[in-house]
Amino acid sequence: MAAFADRPTCRVSLGAVFLARELHRLRKSLPLCVFSLFLFSFAFSALSGAPSQFAEAAMPKLSGEKLAELMQMDVKDIKERMLALFDLIDTNQDNTIDTEEAKEWSAKLKNAMHQHQVRMEFQAIDKDNDGKVSLSELEATYVDSLDQKQLEQHKKEVEQRFKTVDKDNDGLLDLSEIRILMDPGKDEGLMKIEIEEILNAQDKNGDRKITVTEFIETEGTGSLNDVEKTELEKEFKSYDLNADGAIDVEELQQIIKDPHSHEIRMLLEEFTKDLKDGKVGREQWEKEFESFAVSMLTDNGEVLRFPEDYSGIEFPFKTAVPQVDVDDEDKHDEL
């Protein structure tokens, strides 16, 4: 669901709330875009929005030439990196990547990129470069571009979050506190704020549950076609963990605490649906490297292009594309 890294688009979805829903909504400019393909490009319709993109996570059909053009790399280099990557993912060295290995690797990638995002976001907010973030700096980042009618309310919401994560009460946020801000599931106070705002936006009858009807009504902007409605129903079911027809507070808590788990589960379904027994062998990986090169196992190709951004993971290759002085949104553009 949508994190700071996401670039807002046209419609909204429940997911974004679970990484940093409110701050995603308030963000004036988004300096990070590494998760734009499927990573949390969602937000509530009461806020601002982005279409669900889980369906886009399936492996696309690209020629080697087209892939090389998009990645700004040559085909030979891509293929070599893919083979090296296979060996990293295949932890038991049986020349097969199974569902569990794919899941573990994807979680490792997401955790590494999240830490990178936190550092980049901290630098973007800390305008005076003093190593701390003040309330005014946070407001300047997340409030300034909003409609004047909503400005005061949004300032209050930002201030509430600021005070919640300012654990030492010094009126400033350090990197560890910004890390909490971007991961509300790790802080009880922040999670309560998130849950209440989710319910305020979605729970129309005040029973502290979100039905599929409420979900679709809130998510829909204008009339929805059958395909869009079906996708929303599918998305709703993925949040309704006990399948009782409603998303309750306990389910919200579970998803907020571990948003990556939910997303990886959805992506894994797409990734494995066309694989025999849900596995991919080294021979198939090499033969169909173009497709796997833009799958969840490469973070849609980002791992191949910008391995240094994944802190804590040692890759046998380095960034291949010259990194010019541009915004991260340009650097990590969608494939």
Curated annotation (Swiss-Prot):
One Pfam short name: EF-hand_5
Binding-site residues, Ca(2+) 1: D126, D128, D130, K132, E137
Segments traversing the membrane: 30-50
Source taxon at top rank: Eukaryota
Annotated positions binding Ca(2+) 2: D166, D168, D170, E177
Motif (Prevents secretion from ER): 332-335
Major subcellular location class: endoplasmic reticulum
Topology of the protein relative to the lipid bilayer: Single-pass membrane protein
Function: Calcium-binding protein. Participates in the efflux of intracellular Ca(2+) and storage of Ca(2+) in the endoplasmic reticulum. Required for gliding, host cell invasion and egress. Required for microneme secretion.
InterPro entries membership: EF-hand-dom_pair, EF_Hand_1_Ca_BS, EF_hand_dom
List of residues binding Ca(2+) 4: D240, N242, D244, E251
Localisation per UniProt entry: Endoplasmic reticulum membrane; Cytoplasm, Cytosol
Disruption phenotype: Gene knockout results in slower parasite proliferation represented by the formation of smaller plaques compared to their parental counterparts. Lower invasion capability. Longer duration before egress from the host cells. Reduced parasite gliding motility and average trail length. Reduced virulence in mice. Loss of the regulatory ability of Ca(2+) efflux. Impaired Ca(2+) storage in endoplasmic reticulum. Impaired microneme secretion. No significant differences in in vitro replication.
Protein name per the record: Calcium-binding protein TgpCaBP
Endoplasmic reticulum among keywords: yes
Any GO CC annotation of this UniProt entry: endoplasmic reticulum membrane
